[in-house]
Amino acid sequence: VTGVPEHHLLISMCEGLTIANPRGGDNLPGVAESWEISEDGRTYTFYLNKNALWSNGDQVTAQDFVWSWMRILTPSLGSQYPDMLYYLKGAEEFHQGKISNFSDVGVSAINDHELKVELKNPTPFFIRLLSHYSTYPVHKETVLKHGTIDDRNGKWTRPGNFVCNGPMNLKAWELNKQIIVEKNPLYWDADRVRLNEIRYYPVSNESTEDRMFRAGQLHVTNVVPLEKCPIYIENENPNLRIEPYMGTYFYRINTLHPVLKNKDVRLALAFAINRKQIVEKVSKCGQAAAYSFTPPGSAGYEPDTDVPFNPELARSLLADSGYANGEGFPV
C-alpha cells in the first residue's frame, strides 16, 4: 500500500498508536491512550487503551504491534515502508538480514497493555511517525489464516475476512467500482463517529470527478482539474476550500547511473527546472515552489537552500561534465 488515496481509506478502518491531529499540532492518542519518554529520548513506553478492540471482538494488545512491526520488517514481504521503523534499535539490521532474531529489535511487549520501544537515537518526531499506516497493527490470526507473514496476496484483506481496529469496517470491495466501509460498533471511540457509511469511488479522470462532485454524486473530492482551479478561486466558489497540504512532489534520481552519479549533472538538472513557472503557469492552485524536501513551516522549519532557475549555470555544469550543448547526454 502506498499513496494518498490509500491513506484516506486505511485511516478510516485502521488505527495506530497515535492519530494525526486534524487541526495541526501534536498527534492525539490512538490505541495508546498515553506514553512516557525517557530522559535521553530513546525509550518510549506506550500504555494501550484497554477498550481498544479488533472488529471481531479480540482485544488489541502490545504483542499485536510487535508482530505487525516484525511483519513490516520481514525482508521477503517487500514492504514499501520498512524504513519508517529504522529508527528502532536493530530494525534496519533485521530488515537487511544482518540479524535474524527479532528480539534484538527495539520493540517488546511488557504485558498486554504496555509496549516498550527503544530507538537508536533521540527522534523528536517519532510520535508523529506512529500515525503512518506502516506502523498500524494487523490481526495476526487473520493474516496467518489466509497466508503467511510475508504473503503479499493473502485473502485476509477481502470483505468478510478483514479484521481491523479503526472507526470503520470493510463492508464491500468491488474492483474498479467502489469500496464501502461502515461504522465499527466495537471501536473504542465509536460514540464520536458521526458517519454510518463511506463509499470510495476509484475515479481516474479528474474532470469526471469534478463533474460528479458538481452534480451531487460525490460529497467530497480533493481533486480539482488544473484548468478549473484558477476559475474557482477567481469566482470565490463556496465549495472550494484550500488548506495547507504537507506534500512535496519531486523527481527521484538514480544516483547509481553512470551519468547521474555525477553531482554536477544532478545540479544541472536542478538548475534547469523553473519551479516558479510550474506553480504559476501549470498547477495554478496556490502551490509553492519546492526548493527543499521538507515543506516550509513544518514544525517551525524554514529551508536555507535555494536552487533558482538558472539555465546558463545548468549549461555550464553540463559542459564541464562533458555534455556541451547537451550533446551526448542520454535521453
Task: Map each language-model feature to its residues.
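Short, well-ordered beta-strand elements
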Residues: 1, 33, 43-46, 65-68, ...
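Gly/Pro-rich hinge or "lid" segments in bacterial periplasmic/extracellular proteins
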Residues: 21-22, 113, 119-197, 205-207, ...
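Append "and occasionally in soluble cytosolic enzymes with long acidic Gly/Pro-rich linkers
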Residues: 182-183, 261-331
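N-terminal lobe/hinge region of extracytoplasmic solute-binding protein
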Residues: 1-40, 70, 161-164
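Aromatic- and charge-enriched surface segment that lines or borders ligand/interaction sites
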Residues: 33-84, 116-118, 209-212, 259
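Extracellular/periplasmic solute-recognition and catalytic clefts
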Residues: 171-182, 199-257, 267-268, 276, ...
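Surface-exposed binding/hinge segments that line
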Residues: 47, 64-66, 73, 77-145
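A structural "hinge/loop" feature
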Residues: 1-8, 31, 58, 126-137, ...
